[in-house]
Amino acid sequence: MKQYEAVIRVMEENGGYATLGFLNQNVLKIADCKWGTKTPFASIRRIVQDDRFFFKIRPGLWALKSHRGKLPSEVLPSKDEPKELQEEYSHTYFQGLLVEIGNVRKYQTFVPNQDKNRLYLGKKLSAIASINDIHRFSFDHVVAKAKTIDVIWFNERDMPASVFEVEHSTDLRNSLLKFVELQDFNSKFRIVADTARTKEFHARLSLDAFRPISNRVKFWTYEEVADLHSKTSALAAVEAKLEL
């Protein structure tokens, strides 16, 4: 079997689409395909860019051209879908990537109650987040604010190690205010958004209200999250092979 055929098979078995991270973890498991290269993950990345067979849906997510009209709405929304719903699908997708990254990195992952039933590539977010209820790590009013954050990674001491807000079009101020509530904890704060919002991010963060956290908040683009997801998955695949 040729390498591109192995990628096609994995996608077909997954419904005609897959994240690059999913491909990294599964393509090399196909026994009758030989990868005579020291950089198989780079080869997979190159293969999915072959527009004879594949097309890109969003950062980190690819599909088979043969399945274009068969994909679920949350994977590839039709142009007739309301803009709000398309934005919700995109928002949930990046939440899902962050949850999966956290899971691989051995964190406890949490998503808010209002998002648990949203679909991430055919699965509810609640099905991939590792904890259902937020840890009571502080006073009630602090936890109440934290439980609305898009994704939280909790460490082994049940404390919030990293918190993420995915922002497509809403005001970044709301997310930064949530981070302010957690300023007394040793947490990393991350805003995930389109690169076009970088200037807006820095403008908001420069306000006096956010001075206490200004050096702790970082901006991640959608592309950076997708890249982290694929590389984290590739590392996990190597570790599994070596039985680490």
PLM segments and residue spans:
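Charged low-complexity interaction tracts in eukaryotic proteins
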Residues: M1-Y4, G21, I30-K79
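Hydrophobic residues on short alpha-helical segments
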Residues: Y4-M11
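Short capping segments at the starts of secondary-structure elements
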Residues: E12-T19
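Active-site metal-binding core of divalent-cation-utilizing nuclease and nuclease-like domains
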Residues: E81-E87, N103, V111-D158, K231-A240
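Long, charge-rich, low-complexity intrinsically disordered regions
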Residues: F94-E100, V104
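Catalytic cores of nucleic-acid endonucleases
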Residues: A129, H135-I149, F154-E223
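C-terminal helix of von Willebrand factor
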Residues: R216-L244
